[in-house]
Amino acid sequence: MVARFIFLSFIMLVGTLAPAKAQNSFPYPALPDSLRSVEQRAAYLSEHYWDNFNFSDTLELANKEMAEQGFVNFIDILARFDQEIAQKGIAAFTAKAYQQKPSKEKFESLIEHYYENPESPMRNDRVYALFLEDMAKSPYFDETEKERIGFKLKQARKNLPGTQATNISFMLEDGKPHQLSDYREKKVILYFYDPDCENCHKISAWLDKQTIPAGISLLRIVADNRLSTIYGLKAMPTIYLLDKENKVILKDCTPEQLMEALRGNENRK
């Protein structure tokens, strides 16, 4: 897996880089001196990130340190922005990336790998949906491709943060039927798992050792085919955090992200 940059260090580092590119490094844009804050620099970078990358150069496309590492850093940045800024960055990227077949195939493959691979730490359906929306509108994809993209977009949009979680019926360890809508007035952790998944049991044991604040319901739900389809589950386990109205706070998060969010909530009290 290609390495992720630490966000703040990355933004400050880019500000010191010249646009000239080394043989094996991504050609980051020079940031205007007038941009003083991290937020301003980051917003500019998202929109101008690909200005110096030559999408028609097959050597650059094949260079993992340039094309793939550059893409990983790009999507890491996008995940930290609101919808409007992320959309602008993606629009600037897609306006160039899909014009020629080698570039289109390269980046379509990277998008699929980093957003659909269950092992990818970069999975983020909010940002993935923005890429898919742009691909669905692009003149560089034919109708057959757009039909496939449309299906993926429908899956990615399921239960995004800020939306109402789909109500489901399920069985818990008590053997009784439950409805998600029954769990109101408390935050809810949905822990979808496969009983035969070794990693599920490891993460479940890890969670048992953590301090989950009082007033939060942890629901361990066996992910059968029906639930996997409804929630578009890609990996086991899959963890959601819902608010007291069953609105999604975190979707498909790591155990560490879950505990960080719970600790942050406790600190705000």
What are these regions (language model features)?
Residues 1-25:
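Bacterial Sec-dependent N-terminal signal peptides
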Residues 23-167, 172:
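Oxidative protein folding and maturation machinery
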Residues 172, 242-243:
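Short, acidic, Ser/Thr-enriched surface-loop or helix-capping motifs
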Residues 176-205:
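Short active-site neighborhood of thiol/selenol oxidoreductases, capturing the structured segment around
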Residues 199-212, 255:
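Typically the conserved alpha-helix immediately C-terminal to a functionally engaged Cys/Sec
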Residues 214-226:
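Thiol-based oxidoreductase modules, predominantly thioredoxin-like and allied folds used
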Residues 231-240:
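Structural micro-motif
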Residues 244-269:
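Non-catalytic, surface beta->alpha helical segment in thiol-disulfide oxidoreductase systems
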